[in-house]
Amino acid sequence: MTKNKNVIEVEGKVVECLRSAMFTVELENGHQVLAHISGKIRKNYIKIMLEDRVLVELPPYDLTRGRIVFRYRN
C-alpha cells in the first residue's frame, strides 16, 4: 500500500471514534493505538465507523500512534 519502506502495516478494528478524525484502533495482537486518517481517505470522503476493519501504518519510532490508510469492505 505504501511507498515508504520504513513503516509497519498492520490490520485492526476501530473501537472508538474521537474528535478531529482520530480513532482508537485495536490491532490484531491486542494492542490499542491512536490513529488518524490519511489524506487520500479524507480527500475521497471515505467514512470510517465503529467496528470497521482498517489497515494502519505504524512508524518504527512510535508504536502508539498510526495512520489509517485503507478501510476494508465488510
Swiss-Prot record:
Keyword Lipid metabolism assigned: no
Self-association state and partner proteins as the record states: Component of the 30S ribosomal translation pre-initiation complex which assembles on the 30S ribosome in the order IF-2 and IF-3, IF-1 and N-formylmethionyl-tRNA(fMet); mRNA recruitment can occur at any time during PIC assembly.
Protein name per its UniProtKB record: Translation initiation factor IF-1 2
Any coiled-coil regions, as ranges: none
Purpose of the protein: One of the essential components for the initiation of protein synthesis. Stabilizes the binding of IF-2 and IF-3 on the 30S subunit to which N-formylmethionyl-tRNA(fMet) subsequently binds. Helps modulate mRNA selection, yielding the 30S pre-initiation complex (PIC). Upon addition of the 50S ribosomal subunit IF-1, IF-2 and IF-3 are released leaving the mature 70S translation initiation complex.
Subcellular location: Cytoplasm
Gene: infA2
Organism, scientific name: Streptomyces avermitilis (strain ATCC 31267 / DSM 46492 / JCM 5070 / NBRC 14893 / NCIMB 12804 / NRRL 8165 / MA-4680)
SMART domains listed in its UniProt record: S1
HAMAP family, per database record: IF_1
Residue ranges of every copy of the S1-like domain listed in the record: 1-73
PROSITE patterns membership: S1_IF1_TYPE
